[in-house]
Amino acid sequence: MDLPVDEWKSYLLKKWASLPKSVQDTISTAETLSDIFLPSSSLLQPEDEMFLKELSSSYSVEKDNDAPLFYREEGNRKFQEKEYTDAAVLYSKGVSHSRPNTEDISLCYANRSAALFHLGQYEACLKDIVEAGMHGYPERLQPKMMVRKTECLVNLGRLQEARQTISDLESSLTAKPTLVLSSYQILQRNVQHLKIKIQEKETLPEPIPAALTNAFEDIALGEENTQISGASLSVSLCTHPLKGRHLVATKDILPGELLVKEDAFVSVLIPGEMPRPHHCLENKWDTRVTSGDLYCHRCLKHTLATVPCGSCSYAKYCSQECMQQAWDLYHSTECSLGGLLLTLGVFCHVALRMTLLARFEDVDRVVRMLCDEVGSTDTCLPESKNLVKAFDYTSQGESEEKSKIGEPPIPGCNVNGKYGSNYNAIFSLLPHTEKHSPEHRFICAISVSALCRQLKADSVQAQTLKSPKLKAVTPGLCADLTVWGAAMLRHMLQLQCNAQAITSICHTGSNESIITNSRQIRLATGIFPVVSLLNHSCRPNTSVSFTGTVATVRAAQRIAKGQEILHCYGPHESRMGVAERQQRLSSQYFFDCRCGACHAETLRAAAAPRWEAFCCKTCRALMQGNDVLSCSNESCTNSVSRDQLVSRLQDLQQQVCMAQKLLRTGKPEQAIQQLLRCREAAESFLSAEHTVLGEIEDGLAQAHATLGNWLKSAAHVQKSLQVVETRHGPSSVEIGHELFKLAQVLFNGLAVPEALSAIWKAERILLVHCGPESEEVRELREMRSCLLDSSFVPVGPLV
């Protein structure tokens, strides 16, 4: 996903193994980017490019004239099954493969409008109706579309427009009575029904505008930090010989305080599951729903009404504005490279986009500093002592003068000492060139070389054909492949340590269930220069959340003045043990973690955390040991082999998965019976706070909620809460999500005092971690408003 597809990696590893040792040594011992890039690039042969071209053709993003009909029929099948979301996505795939101003695209837009109507997305439905008309929607089908348009307008309260649409429809039917009698009669009944509906709406009082609290709350930082763009005045940028650049608190900070709000300098949406290779005969077209089908490829906004790129079938956007911005900034170059970029991976794609978004003359100037001084490690390896000289390319003379009269500027800062979210800061992020394996450097360098050659070929073709399509690839940019390639290679190496996973909270649950499970999904890979200043801790004092491409960093606890502000890079103490955390951080980020959590765990005796622990079948005390586990209760002599307990746990997990499948397929009663058997088995050898017991209780809560047994569901959520709290802590975002679920159950069960209490607890925690713009916080506030409404009269909880 981040790196090239396995076939290309394997191919290059074989090529690396076949190289003479002298060539391997040249690349392995290279100290500059140009010393890595130039020898590697010279090794890229025509047969290598042909192999990569064949691989890329398997992930083609060209429009297929036969695809719209297939996707429309698949969408129709889902529509008949009332799976309207899946239907909308399939119609969108049809739109993406359609040519403008064809019946194919107009029918796909029209059908998608029907799916959006059933999902209550009336504004999006109206836009699709307009698009269908613009692309030549057949006149014979227009009356049906006008009825749908009227229904949308009525539901939106736009009654004058609804009346005009009805009038236009009646005039059209009178002027061209082409419908068969039965269809005409059905249409007339629909028209009369809509007229009555409009009259009823007109007698209702004006709707009250949505409360301001339901709108997106401004989370501006207030007064601007003059040292760091996008940061609050509560933080300051410092340097340290061991820590490097890092952020510290300038005052005492309270939980929930906003510290950094930064838009990604670059982000690339992750395709999710890779598209099936087109040589797979069993499925020529992919019907799977991935993140690439649900989110705007520029701003990452969730949308079912995607706007397609006019030239490829892959890129999709939330609006014409986003599509045009993407085209102007980078997609005009990337569009024809779609299959190649999918093959080379997200990191290569991000590296290309980072360079495209920079001012090209700056890129040339920066990387020429590296390439012109092939023998100098001072400018090519920013880890070296002449750090400032390597970075301050914006005004080198002024910087040298400044360093004579005082402290040198912090790397990435401009001549005024400000660190911004710009290419200068991006370039200052460390690539750790010497720490990457020789094989990894070779794979990256060859991949970038192949991309550069294709860029040059596209540029020559564009000039020959005088095509504006690839105008972003300027002749100057492709004139020197060393400059272009060295910049992208640097960025590709930077990304292993500096890329940020942009995530979103995904709510899942069966169609019948009103309560939802929350899980974090990775949407995109982004680069955030300011967020990258945060050092890691396995027990961080901040929470990072995302709204589209904007990262928000909040204090997760009290942070004292002078204390370092820390972020978790992924390996968190509540998710994995110290040994696994240390291994992951060392292999990906090249450092040995010495945070408080790692230090405390190393000092403790090696014992499994309670959420992974086994218990004694006799006295329920925790078991301890390595290959053979003994009861921790001194008066109990019970012992058992670890392998035996692990085998039992694996069998139990399979049984839980079977129960979850029953729940997903609409069989809650059977799921309950299966889960109760699982719970009985689990309690005989697992600790009361074991994660699997939490999953069982969560499944029972879902099943009872599906059946409307709200109080029983709430009781199981309470037990699941105990497991989550043991693992993640009482103030964690995970507890916030679980309390949100409890609030939903109690709200639906009309248990007013209990629901209000759960809402208050959930909101208090989620505000700290996610802020007031969180969807869950908004829903909690809506539930509270409803419960406190004087007109709300509970009829007693449903059992």
Swiss-Prot record:
Changing residue 208 to V: In strain: Czech II. CDD domains: SET_SMYD4 (cd10536). SUPFAM superfamilies: HIT/MYND zinc finger-like (SSF144232), SET domain (SSF82199), TPR-like (SSF48452). PROSITE patterns: SET, ZF_MYND_1, ZF_MYND_2. Changing residue 397 to E: In strain: Czech II. Its EC number is 2.1.1.-. Keywords: Cytoplasm, Metal-binding, Methyltransferase, Nucleus, S-adenosyl-L-methionine, Transferase, Zinc, Zinc-finger. GO terms for cellular component: cytoplasm; nucleus. It holds the Pfam family SET. Zn(2+) 2 binds at residues 309, 312, 331, 335. InterPro entries: SET-MYND_domain_protein (IPR052097), SET_dom (IPR001214), SET_dom_sf (IPR046341), SMYD4_SET (IPR044421), TPR-like_helical_dom_sf (IPR011990), Znf_MYND (IPR002893). Its main location: nucleus. It catalyses: L-lysyl-[protein] + S-adenosyl-L-methionine = N(6)-methyl-L-lysyl-[protein] + S-adenosyl-L-homocysteine + H(+). Gene3D superfamilies: 6.10.140.2220, SET domain, Tetratricopeptide repeat domain. S-adenosyl-L-methionine binds at residues 112-114, 535-536, 569, 591. Interacts (via MYND-type zinc finger) with HDAC1. PANTHER family: SET AND MYND DOMAIN-CONTAINING PROTEIN 4. This is Protein-lysine N-methyltransferase SMYD4. It comes from Mus musculus. The gene is Smyd4.
